[in-house]
UniProtKB/Swiss-Prot annotation:
It comes from Coxiella burnetii (strain Dugway 5J108-111). Belongs to the thioester dehydratase family. FabZ subfamily. Disulfide bonds: none annotated. This is 3-hydroxyacyl-[acyl-carrier-protein] dehydratase FabZ. The gene is fabZ. Gene3D superfamilies: Hotdog Thioesterase. Pfam families: FabA.
Length: 142
């Protein structure tokens, strides 16, 4: 799924669209996506000028956007739908390496549980197969 298709399923836009491509989807189960991190990202202007590092909260947001696409595809919502899923919680977040300009972030989300509209995911972000971040994410329809 390319960027044009991604924009049909989630409402995020520049500068807050943090997924470039979806490379694998298993409805109701998992999704793998990528984010190409470039020096032109607006957040690098202030985080940090001497050594640009992608903010951890934006890595978490990237995982949440991947989860959002998985929800939409799992529920068979049509392109251009108006549903928005919001964070309901983030648990057990850990950051293991920095993400810098030039890195390609691989984002993997797996459905752990769906109950009464609350979706719980396991998220993992890696660079060159090295763990950058992991967290459990919860989302609910807004």
């Amino acid at each position: 799924m390319n960027i044009t298709d991604i924009k049909k399923y989630i409402p995020h836009r520049y500068p807050f669209l943090l997924i470039d491509r979806v490379i694998k989807i298993e409805k109701d189960k998992s999704l793998v996506a990528i984010k190409n991190v470039t020096v032109n990202e607006p957040f690098f202007t202030g985080h940090f000028p001497v050594r640009p590092v992608m903010p951890g909260v934006l890595i978490i947001e990237s995982l949440a956007q991947a989860a959002g696409i998985l929800i939409v595809k799992s529920l068979n919502l049509p392109e251009g739908h108006k549903d928005i899923y919001f964070f309901a919680g983030v648990d057990n977040a850990r950051f293991k390496r920095v993400v810098e300009p030039g890195d390609q972030l691989t984002l993997e989300v797996k459905v752990l549980k769906v109950h009464r509209g609350l979706w719980k995911f396991e998220g993992k972000a890696t660079v060159d197969d090295q763990l950058a971040c992991k967290a459990e994410l919860m989302t609910i329809k807004g």
